[in-house]
Amino acid sequence: MAVAHTPVARTAANPYKVFIAGGCYSGLAAAINLLERCDSNAENPIPVAITIVDERDGFYHVIGSPLALADKKYAEKAWVEFKDVKILQRPDVQFLHGSVTKVDTATKTATLRESADLHERTETYDFFIGATGLRRAWPVVPQALTRKTYLIEAGRHIDAVTSSSDPVLVVGGGAVGIEMAAELKTVQPNIKVTLAHSREKLLSAEPLPDMVKDCALELTRAAGVECLMDHRLTTSKLIKNAAGQDAYEVEFENGHKMTASVVIVAISKSVPSTDFLPKEALSEEGLVNILPSLQLANKDIPNSESHFAVGDLINWSGIKRCGGAMHEGKYAGLNIHQIMQHELEGKEVKLNEIGEIPPMIGLAVGKSAVSYGPDGMNSGPQVMQVFFEEDLGFRICWDHLRLGGDPA
């Protein structure tokens, strides 16, 4: 593969500058795998300087949101400030708390707005990785941008759902709604939890066979959640219940009415967080068009081969999953290392490429889970253990990314 770079000797004073927008699963995977490869030749390591920008001040385990919004102890665990991500505490990595507002691919310059004072600054780079994911609404994910305010936000939510005699209503029977309802019921078994979905089957928006959707319903009911199918919410009005507490009078399109202590709307049209990229790089939905090598697909964009995109923001097949995001981040890191080696040593570039991703899912439902992929469907407590363990996959992801490992 031809790469349009002019070889320049690299030293500690003139390292390769890599700018990563987004510090979750895919962004951290890219950084860690790239550093590992650059350090692999102890006698002649490749000097790099990595900048990771994120709106949050830490790694937040997004998969764990349903449990983080049901259990205060777990909420403390699910958000780890970047200063406590051990493997990346090294002089060639800097974390910036802020948001990327613009990327100029021609000059290889990123503009970002710092969270502390809204000051705008620019950073130049040799390689760019977009890993900012999708913007998801509350309460699908917390909206707080610091660990401190997140714990307050999560705590208030948990207090609200645990302090009333009326049932908690979760609206939306996609993966998030199912997991939120089931986690809440499992952690707080004394609360009545109702899940309402506008369609005949749960997971109706996903390209999954009916047996998976039916199994999800069976497991949700077995977890103790009341499921209302074909119930589309029309109105939700704040009232005082019989005990004088704030509650909601809810009405559905079919005429069914109920009183709920809290209404959790788990229907979220997630929006790609890609405004900072050139329009020419994006699909109509705002996802990033990529080559299988994870580089920008549009060759008319200046320096497209130096710009990568990974994780939920890419326009690619498959259901958005953190396993895929970590894999893509790894490949982006390895591919950037390949290009560096080509520049420095003239080595032939052999880029790693992702393949088409078939529909697959792992869904936690209380103490059980259902999984589906090319090998078919499995369900039960043993699936929960394999896919999520006791903490909705926190340890699995933390250890897979090696976030607690020693920095090189």
Go through each PLM region and give its residues.
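Rossmann-like NAD(P)H-binding beta-loop-alpha module
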Residues: 163-195
